[in-house]
């Protein structure tokens, strides 16, 4: 890749995923308020936050270069991503506490839960923004409270939407998965990202 690549995320999971495509990127913290707006749908929320994170990441990159505004910024492609889960029509986010994680998994037990990941790529110089919503459905096993409690205490998925880490023991919670890209569930849909980078004139294969 010729253009500087910025990941607007401090998530170690997203960093590990992006490293599958290239080791040459910089991470910045986007510092975006993730509170949903009144009556905002899951799809609208993840698009708004992914775009906001990409722009905030560009601004942080600009500040680190010592530049005064985006119009004078060196060219970079900034990746923003956000994910929420929907259970029984309600948006759920990161549980933050063990009690909330146990409650989320009790709600999910025996059900199909859809995750929506918003992915944005923003050019810091031209201001071109591309964005996509990538859905992924998880079919949960019917889980006992003892199983859920054991899982939460073992893996502590407190900062994961849906209260699990699919790249770890969380895979044991699932009956089956539905989606085009399993990386989506971890937080960064790589197949979609490759296509979006191509829209900005970049390829990961050279």
Curated annotation (Swiss-Prot):
Annotated Pfam families: Maf
Q: What does the record give as EC number?
A: 3.6.1.-
Q: Note whether NADP occurs among the keywords.
A: no
Q: Which Gene3D superfamilies match?
A: 3.90.950.10
Provide the GO biological process annotations.
nucleotide metabolic process
**Claim: Cytoplasm is one of the keywords in the record:** yes
Keywords associated with the record: Cytoplasm, Hydrolase, Nucleotide metabolism
| A single MF term (Gene Ontology) | nucleoside triphosphate diphosphatase activity
Q: Which cofactor does it need?
A: a divalent metal cation
What is the catalytic activity of this protein? Answer: N(7)-methyl-GTP + H2O = N(7)-methyl-GMP + diphosphate + H(+)
Under SUPFAM superfamilies, the record lists: ITPase-like
| Location(s), subcellular | Cytoplasm
GO cellular component terms? cytoplasm
Could you say which residues are annotated as the site Important for substrate specificity?
A: 13, 83, 167
Q: Where is the active site?
A: 82
The protein's predominant localisation is cytoplasm
Similarity comment: family membership = Belongs to the Maf family. YceF subfamily.
PANTHER family listed in its UniProt record: 7-METHYL-GTP PYROPHOSPHATASE, BIFUNCTIONAL DTTP/UTP PYROPHOSPHATASE/METHYLTRANSFERASE PROTEIN-RELATED
Described purpose of this protein according to its UniProt entry: Nucleoside triphosphate pyrophosphatase that hydrolyzes 7-methyl-GTP (m(7)GTP). May have a dual role in cell division arrest and in preventing the incorporation of modified nucleotides into cellular nucleic acids.
**Protein's name according to its UniProt entry:** 7-methyl-GTP pyrophosphatase
